[in-house]
């Protein structure tokens, strides 16, 4: 019997099922959105709860710790409590903790509520993936996975836009309150559509609690290292060294134990399957570039162009909105084109958008970023759906939950590592370029002296901020100083030197960002290799067989 005959006999998908899928996808979208939307308003949140500096970064870190721990646990806990109960309760708690975050008065409260928000919101991501694979027939998996790709790629891109607008228009608490309206719609949709299944509390007695504890400790320590490492000079800090050792020991022991446990909390054996293992590696590298690029662009605009949160968000929208046009077409492409080829094309296009930013300069702002952002949007939109589909080929329905948790955790982990990597890479490359430029700019060089002289004349005409001994000036400037008094030529030489130094730093900063985009382009090109080694599947339907 042919696949076409199977599809012809397949019963139509009930409306109730589509409502369940839509509600689950809305939840996954909110969970991913809450990573980027908060980062945009972070300086304002820090001011609102009277904190800042290195401590303020814990507002983001806390959410990520909760999320990265619960994602791989979701399959096990949904079996214990049933998908319906587990999803509904966590959705309600996610909304509650969102409100509590908006009401937080100090950093301690905010960290607590953000951990709990991440722990409940993280459930929404893998369960949306599981519901697609378990409730939709194989022929409709591509459509469901296309919807899921919107949550995975569109949400990080549009998050800064929404966060910037809400913060500037209504204040920082609204970056948390925005979850309420769609969250209530999601609750109603899932309450109506998800089937009731029995609980299995007996699984708690047989639970792999040793593995759960090791995984939670290891992932929490690793996430903290990734978020704080650059600020604390990585292994130059005893704090980072200790956390790294804890993460390494806990995760290594966890991995070893999971292979020898009869009922592991995370089924790592799935990674031995060619398509799932290679697909998960590709997903990890995609997450690396996806989240790192979403981090880099607003940073570049803020640091080099002086953009505020709303202005940076408007530029990021160019990366998000085109995806809404492309993603619905991807299931149609998958019917006619090998999924591996689609993923490869998407990765090439995504990498091209990164390489387009190699020519950054001081005038490279919103208009110049339009086409790289649009190209990036197209690449991201093409990649996610076929990658998810072909990675799930050979995964049985009973394994869908375990595969979903592992697959999505690796993308999130890739994003955390990618963001930390580009932060550190930028710091090192900025220092490198600053050193090289300074080595070629000397006060003994005629061009440098001429530039400083021009700047001195400019500051004499327009005024300068600091004071300087007029004896330090030269030629006509010194005579002018003697005639007018030191106050008349306040600080012109120092102002000129500072201006030259600022130009050097600005150029080194821009070159550092360009190098980061080059790094992401190389990572995306490298991601093509595991994709090329995948076996050809039967499309999204392969996940069900």
Residue ranges and their predicted role:
Residues 133-136, 191-196, 226, 255-260, ...:
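Structural signal for the C-terminal ends of transmembrane alpha-helices
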Residues 176-191, 215-218, 243-250, 515-532:
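Symmetry-related core transmembrane helices of the 12-TM Major Facilitator Superfamily/SLC fold
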Residues 117, 121-150:
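Cytoplasmic helix-loop-helix junction between adjacent transmembrane helices
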Residues 52, 274, 278, 288, ...:
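Loop-to-transmembrane-helix entry motif
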Residues 147-149, 155-160, 164, 293, ...:
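Small-residue-rich alpha-helical segments with characteristic i,i+4
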Residues 15-79, 84-93, 98, 102, ...:
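Transmembrane core module of solute transporters
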Residues 180-222, 229, 234-242, 265-272, ...:
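Central mid-sequence intracellular linker of multi-pass
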Residues 1-28, 32, 275, 454-545:
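Transmembrane-helix exit segments and adjacent C-terminal regions of multi-pass membrane proteins
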